[in-house]
UniProtKB/Swiss-Prot annotation:
This is Pre-glycoprotein polyprotein GP complex. It comes from Machupo virus (MACV). The chain crosses the membrane at residues 18-32, 34-53, 436-456. Residues 2-17, 54-58, 59-435 are extracellular. InterPro entries: Arena_glycoprot, Arena_glycoprot_zinc-bd.
Amino acid sequence: MGQLISFFQEIPVFLQEALNIALVAVSLIAVIKGIINLYKSGLFQFIFFLLLAGRSCSDGTFKIGLHTEFQSVTLTMQRLLANHSNELPSLCMLNNSFYYMKGGVNTFLIRVSDISVLMKEHDVSIYEPEDLGNCLNKSDSSWAIHWFSNALGHDWLMDPPMLCRNKTKKEGSNIQFNISKADDVRVYGKKIRNGMRHLFRGFHDPCEEGKKCYLTINQCGDPSSFDYCGMDHLSKCQFDHVNTLHFLVRSKTHLNFERSLKAFFSWSLTDSSGKDMPGGYCLEEWMLIAAKMKCFGNTAVAKCNQNHDSEFCDMLRLFDYNKNAIKTLNDESKKEINLLSQTVNALISDNLLMKNKIKELMSIPYCNYTKFWYVNHTLTGQHTLPRCWLIRNGSYLNTSEFRNDWILESDHLISEMLSKEYAERQGKTPITLVDICFWSTVFFTASLFLHLVGIPTHRHLKGEACPLPHKLDSFGGCRCGKYPRLRKPTIWHKRH
């Protein structure tokens, strides 16, 4: 752990070296390419298949492709069609004979028959929507009838007026449309009957050619509609939201001051009584569709301190001794200093001179401490430790006579330079970075092998589409048991 922390702390330092940058680049490329190869090999998909097999059969979502899936949405009208004041009207039909419209707190019975209960001479004619106030006691009933009339296609300016019973009479409310297939109302009757077909799917037209036919609307609760508005009738009539949507579309030109339909699937931000509520009144309740909503400084003296088997080092020791002696005897006279120096030099050099004299007598090359040779590296300026140029028979040796010596020194110089460079690089390149580069390369090689081989990810029914997310067994059935075993041949498939 400490090595890893040190590695991250030294990132700004070792990135100054080109080699380190290369190692980092190689590591990143190897890791990224390795992950891509693993993904393309199908290993991840195969593991997901084993982990998730049989666990997604009940979610109702079928995956068709990589980014496409089969889904569904349920249209709910519960809040929209609730029986509250000023809610939208909703429609239902019972046995193709009785039609009902629920508007606010009121329910209306709609029938088509050949019986006329109203007469123009004795009842109220409705020429415009305001006249509905003479027929119905409650304003919420008036706007519902007004809306329904518009949905049927009634034109208040051009079409014949409707008839209604005056609200002061005890018999109850009644509104009548003449939709006969005769006389001068033939075209108007056809338009109203077509409106009924749009509002109520499966509407049966009982009108006969050449005979009278009327569409009547009664408010449930009045004496004239009591027999058909009981709970036994209304409980059997299931309000159909599709019919209601047809009703909304056909009534799109009708404006209601208490709630206005702004768009097909949205409402204005008001409360249930129509008062403005800036910021919304639980908007989800008013929607038709609600959703479940990253050199080492090696001087000649330093080398001689490590190795003293060189004539040059002997001479350096002599010079160094003399220098120290002069510092020690600084207050003595010059004569005494010279005498001491000569004495010391004689004591130190007697042994060397004796050895050289013996070598001279035996014709063996020796050093007279006057000339030295060394090997120099012309590019870097580094050189070897100077060595004495030997003498034999009074003359210096030819370079060819000690060729092996200077070739060996050259090899030592090169080795020393390489060792120095290696040590420098070792100091600047963390071992952790080298390890990362090595193992990332191994990871890339292994992933490349898996990518070339390929791993199957899931079963298919032979010759059919991808079954995801349903995981098939060898018999072609879903592992979770939602679908039976088809006993069709299956094949392992790579990707989908």
